[in-house]
């Protein structure tokens, strides 16, 4: 078992590593472009594909894990761990809550399972020489120990406890009697009245199917109940198909989809079953499970979930077993040695599979377990002549099983007998197999073996005591019978069924004993190897499919990617060109900025020079209009004194100081039409201002009868700036606005009793635009 688990763990680890390596390789090949170059839509599709791959791998892992768990659970009792965990608690509860002899124990109805006995079906495939003979008492003890453990676990969950019977030691008779009395009370607890005379016992026979079969058949539970209430004679076949009669015609359905299609044409059935059909079916997970042929009900926890639903009544029947004419186990063994008619059964029962039951909180269906052994070494020695018959019949597979249960009350005996006869006619010559089972004898206070077989069983049963009859056939006969018509029955997929052992579970007084597990056989090893190979092939196929899908996506988008790549190259080249141009413009702007700054600095420097020059010339006056010949005869200083005496007599008393006077420029230009200016420098700026003020007051200034003009000596820049106001000053002066120039080149004039000052012509034009009178006067000035 540890070898199988280690193989499964190693296989899972290798698979994860392989998936990780393949994913990295695919990612490296598919994402050849940078993330920034791939459009968002492609990345979303690729991410969605990777998520789908992850989901698919996860579902495959769960599916294969369930397969391996199912295979391992067949070799190990699923209730072993639960028994070990609850040993301490349940032993104390069993001792403290053990009922007294004769006390009636109340049972809690779970709806699906009430102290049932598991009918274990296993196939006998090994030959006689491979069987391992075991002592008959050991086989009985082991079987009873298993049944006792399962029943004890069930009572522990329901809050009940019963006496324990130890079959290992024959000397503990008082303990056995107390346990037998408790067991008799437990069997009388169900709602059905006990059989008359107290000689019988109520058994529940449960067909043991795999968890996957129960998961598939669970969908029929409510449909079966509703059809049964309407007396439509539903029948659950072994292949989990639903059959019932409607309008006098038998109908067989294998799934709910076919039943839904049929009921859509029958208003009565559609109204009856409208609450049964599931509303939402499908989904990716169900689709994958159908493709892989697996279900999630094959695990131990899912098996518990299945057992908790209302499906159990389809496979479990309670029967009453008559016990007045039964024989003890020892007597039965001696009779089988002497009777030739029972030799065939003796050979078929050489290998008895022990039941392996799984505990659940609400009742459960048992897991199939097998333990090879014989009834006793003495029986094997006495049945050497029967081994040939057994070896020839052991290879025959049971193709069909039908459980025919008689009615549970005397009022339904006739109807059930007719129905049973009718069902037997549909079996197409199936074999009737004798079998034996253990029942509790309340009189003898012990378990006795009861053997029934075909017609003999019917003769030994009294009225009102139903018995179990098994019909077996080979696969070829069952296939032939199944092809006759709608009355045919389908074969179950249980592997090589050969025995049916109704076993009354006994309980043990001492500790729980965990049965020893056997090493995996060659067939199981081959099965494990085949499972691993199938897993590898499935993973490889999925990876190849994903690779094909990725290649397909790459082929679809490769042209678009190439176009986008070329477009990106063009955009990159264009961006480079634009970047170069922008760089050039930035360089030009930087150069212009530098030039602007240089010009600004030059302007500032010029302003500073102009201001200095104007300050240096602040005490100078220019005399304009004196002819050149006058300069030769008289000096410039004398000319200025003569002008002051002639025009400004009031200034003679103020003692104006004339520092210097000369014509500018120094050189004489023969082509010059006007005479050169005489530059007069006074001792102070105040003297200059008194002379200019007197010249403004006297409108006309002359020198020896010729008209001259006196102005302040300014720098060339200041003179150019003031020259823009010449035309405006003339017009304003004619209109009487008294215009004047303020230093360095500002226009000032009186308007409506206020002095208006303007720094440039644009500001002056904006002002006169709101005054129509001035606007009309200055319209011609640009």
Swiss-Prot record:
This is LINE-1 type transposase domain-containing protein 1. Belongs to the transposase 22 family. Keywords: Phosphoprotein. The modification Phosphoserine is found at residues 136, 407, 409, 442, 478, 490, 559, 567. It comes from the Eukaryota. Residues 1-30, 90-200, 338-397 are annotated as: Disordered. Residues 11-27, 95-107, 143-158, 183-194 have a biased composition (Basic and acidic residues).
């Amino acid at each position: 078992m540890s070898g199988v688990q280690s193989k499964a763990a190693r296989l899972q680890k290798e698979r994860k590593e392989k998936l990780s390596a393949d994913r990295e390789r695919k990612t490296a090949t598919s994402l050849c472009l940078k993330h920034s170059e791939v459009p968002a839509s492609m990345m979303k599709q690729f991410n969605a594909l990777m998520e789908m791959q992850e989901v698919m791998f996860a579902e495959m892992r769960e599916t294969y894990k369930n397969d391996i768990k199912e295979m391992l659970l067949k070799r190990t009792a699923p209730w072993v761990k639960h028994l070990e965990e609850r040993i301490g608690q349940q032993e104390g509860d069993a001792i403290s809550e053990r009922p007294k002899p004769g006390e009636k124990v109340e049972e809690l109805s779970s709806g699906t399972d009430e102290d049932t006995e598991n009918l274990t079906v296993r196939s006998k495939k090994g030959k006689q020489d491979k069987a391992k003979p075991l002592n008959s008492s050991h086989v009985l003890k082991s079987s009873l120990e298993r049944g006792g453990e399962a029943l004890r676990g069930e009572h522990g969950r329901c809050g009940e406890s019963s006496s324990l019977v130890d079959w290992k030691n024959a000397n503990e008779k008082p303990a056995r009697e107390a346990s037998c009395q408790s067991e008799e009370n437990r069997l009388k607890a169900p709602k059905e009245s006990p059989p008359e005379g107290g000689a019988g016992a109520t058994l529940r026979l449960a067909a043991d199917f795999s968890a996957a079969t129960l998961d598939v058949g669970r969908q029929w539970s409510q449909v079966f109940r509703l059809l049964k209430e309407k007396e439509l004679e539903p029948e659950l076949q072994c292949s989990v198909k639903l059959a019932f009669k409607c309008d006098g015609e038998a109908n067989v359905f294998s799934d709910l989809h076919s039943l839904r299609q049929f009921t859509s044409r029958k208003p009565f059935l559609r109204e009856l079953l409208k609450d049964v059909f599931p509303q939402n079916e499908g989904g990716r997970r169900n689709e994958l499970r159908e493709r892989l042929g697996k279900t999630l009900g094959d695990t131990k926890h899912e098996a518990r979930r299945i057992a908790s639903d209302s499906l159990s009544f389809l496979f479990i029947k309670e029967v009453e077993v008559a016990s007045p004419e039964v024989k003890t186990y020892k007597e039965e063994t001696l009779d089988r040695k002497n009777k030739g008619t029972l030799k065939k059964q003796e050979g078929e029962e050489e290998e008895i599979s022990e039941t392996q039951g799984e505990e659940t909180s609400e009742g459960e269906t048992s897991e199939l377990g097998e333990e090879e052994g014989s009834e006793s070494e003495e029986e094997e020695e006495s049945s050497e002549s029967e081994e040939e018959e057994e070896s020839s019949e052991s290879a025959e597979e049971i193709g069909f099983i039908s459980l025919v249960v008689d009615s549970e009350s005397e009022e339904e005996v006739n109807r059930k007998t007719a129905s049973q006869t009718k069902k037997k006619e549909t079996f197409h010559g199936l074999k009737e197999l004798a079998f034996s089972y253990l029942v509790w004898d309340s009189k003898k206070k012990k378990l006795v073996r009861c053997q029934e077989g075909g017609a003999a069983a019917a003769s030994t049963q009294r009225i009102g005591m139903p018995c179990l009859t098994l019909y077996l056939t080979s696969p070829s006969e069952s296939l032939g019978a199944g092809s006759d018509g709608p009355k045919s029955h389908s074969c179950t997929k249980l592997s090589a069924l050969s025995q049916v052992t109704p076993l009354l579970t006994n309980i043990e007084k001492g500790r729980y004993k965990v049965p020893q597990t056997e090493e995996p056989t060659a067939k199981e090893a081959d099965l494990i190897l085949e499972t691993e190979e199938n897993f590898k092939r499935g993973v490889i196929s999925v990876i190849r499919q994903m690779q094909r899908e990725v290649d397909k996506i790459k082929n679809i988008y490769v042209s678009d990617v190439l176009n986008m790549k070329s477009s990106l190259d063009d955009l990159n080249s264009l961006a480079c060109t634009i970047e170069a141009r922008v760089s050039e413009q930035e360089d030009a702007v930087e150069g212009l900025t530098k030039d602007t700054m240089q010009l600004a600095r030059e302007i500032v420097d010029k302003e500073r020079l102009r201001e200095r020059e104007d300050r240096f010339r602040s005490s100078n006056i220019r005399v304009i209009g004196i002819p050149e010949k006058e300069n030769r005869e008289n000096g410039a200083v004398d000319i200025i004194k003569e002008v002051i005496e002639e025009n400004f007599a009031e200034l003679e008393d103020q003692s104006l100081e004339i520092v210097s006077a000369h014509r500018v420029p120094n050189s004489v230009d023969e082509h010059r039409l006007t005479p050169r200016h005489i530059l007069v420098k006074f001792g102070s700026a105040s003297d200059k201002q008194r002379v200019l003020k007197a010249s403004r007051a006297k409108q006309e200034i002359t020198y020896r009868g010729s008209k001259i003009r006196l102005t302040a000596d300014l720098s060339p820049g200041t003179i150019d700036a003031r020259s823009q106001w010449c035309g405006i000053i003339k017009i304003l002066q004619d209109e009487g606005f008294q215009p004047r120039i303020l230093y360095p080149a500002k226009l000032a004039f009186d308007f409506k009793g206020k002095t208006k000052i303007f720094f440039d012509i644009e500001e002056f034009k904006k002002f006169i635009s709101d005054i129509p009178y001035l606007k009309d006067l200055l319209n011609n000035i640009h």
